[in-house]
Amino acid sequence: MTKHSGIDPLTQISPNQHVLIRLPSDNLKIVELKANAIVSLGKFGAFRVNEIIGYRFGTTFDIVYDGVEEEFVKGTQTMIGKISVLENRLKASSPALENSSENNRGLINLGSVVQEMSMAEIEAMKREAASGDAIISKMIESHKSFHQKTVHSQEKYLKRKKQKFAKFFTVEYLDSSGLLHYLIEKGDVLRVMDISQESLGMALNLANINSNGQYLCIDETGGLIVYAMLERMFAGDSNSKANGKIVVVHENEHPNLDLLKFSSYSDNFIQRHVKTISVLDFFEPAKEADIKSLFKPLSAEEINDLKSNKKSAYFRRLKWYHNQLSNIEVAASSFDGLLVASTLYLPTLIPRLGEKIHGSRPIVCYSQYKEPLLELSHSLYENLNYLAPSLLETRCRPYQTVRGKLHPLMTMKGGGGYLMWCHRVLPAAEPKLHQETLEKSEIKNSDEEGDEDAHKLDQEKQVIKRRKPNEDNEKL
């Protein structure tokens, strides 16, 4: 991500980046803001990207159609409107509440009876591109028993109508927490292994992720773990001078890091700081001599003499050659931490990966089930190379407040997964004694044994002396 005409892409909306748009219904949508493009939000309207460039993230915009020429999104009936900035999302399209009742006793719970405005009239206003505020105000005027509702009931009614007819939206920065929230709301819980925002943040903290660290990772969440690690290491800045690196070990032919397409990092930046390697190449890398015997790089003159088809084949082989040498280098490296989110059998995998971790460095494993981590912790208890394996579970219960009431949110998502955390240690070897020390120790032990034998002999003589007078008395 680079600055565009003085715009800071970390705090301000800039072109050619992915953002999170929060709709009036509180649903989320990921949109790529291409310069001079038009973004359609379906029934909520459409707008031009250039009109929101430069505003700060978190700004709420309203789509208005007053004095706008009719122009529709190509292939749809969605009309393109102008953008106006709202001070507060909560105040958007909120007609003033004047009259209310102390209770709902006189209400008639039949919408067709109390609502004089028909659906045909509402659809006609929508086709005329009327604002959400105008539609909601008209519905309130046509509602016979609206003023017989309590204030709380009126607020709930307005909230429902705003979610349906309002045309405002909020642009938010697409960070790892927002991306995870979007995936969960979308229903991709299995894709991210049921991880919660709290578990994700706890894993990054326990793994001690920092900008200049070298980390080993197994990510089966589609790239969410790597996305969060990059955010923690470089804070979304493609111009960062930090030299941190992430090595991603994968079991398939190609790694699944699909979610990195939503990041604002350039391809060169990701290639420089994220290295992928298969499990086989990591544990059993090829020998450097064998690689060099299979391929020999050519000089610049020899490359120029090649034909076009042979030249392309040569560059493919050259890429393979450098990749194999890089795999050998990675397999021989040591790392500052290990972060695993995988369905592989951890009790045999973690000890193998742990050999590549520096001493006094953390190891963090995530699983949506407790049993695999429990079995892993039991196996690590018996291994002196790992210190204090601990199981953690995070729970965050949001509360909602109503007038005079406070209770937990009844529709919250369960689960969130479990974490196993320990430290890689290097046990000190037993000290070797000097030869003279060993000889003195042996002499001392032999002297002590001799003293013990002499003491036992004296005790036996005393026993014999006590027995002899007794025997003489018996004879007499």
From Swiss-Prot:
Report the main location listed first in the record. nucleus
| Similarity comment text for this entry | Belongs to the TRM6/GCD10 family.
Q: Which Pfam families match?
A: Gcd10p (PF04189)
What is the species of this protein?
A: Kluyveromyces lactis (strain ATCC 8585 / CBS 2359 / DSM 70799 / NBRC 1267 / NRRL Y-1140 / WM37) (Yeast)
Query: What gene makes this protein?
Result: TRM6
Where it sits in the cell: the answer is: Nucleus
This one is known as: tRNA (adenine(58)-N(1))-methyltransferase non-catalytic subunit TRM6
Its Gene Ontology molecular function terms? RNA binding
Task: Give me the ranges of the annotated region Disordered.
Answer: 433-476
Q: How does it assemble?
A: Heterotetramer; composed of two copies of TRM6 and two copies of TRM61.
Q: What exactly does this protein do?
A: Substrate-binding subunit of tRNA (adenine-N(1)-)-methyltransferase, which catalyzes the formation of N(1)-methyladenine at position 58 (m1A58) in initiator methionyl-tRNA.
Gene Ontology CC terms: nucleus; tRNA (m1A) methyltransferase complex
Name its GO BP terms in alphabetical order.
Answer: tRNA methylation
Q: Which UniProt keywords apply?
A: Nucleus, RNA-binding, tRNA processing
- Tell me the domain of life: Eukaryota
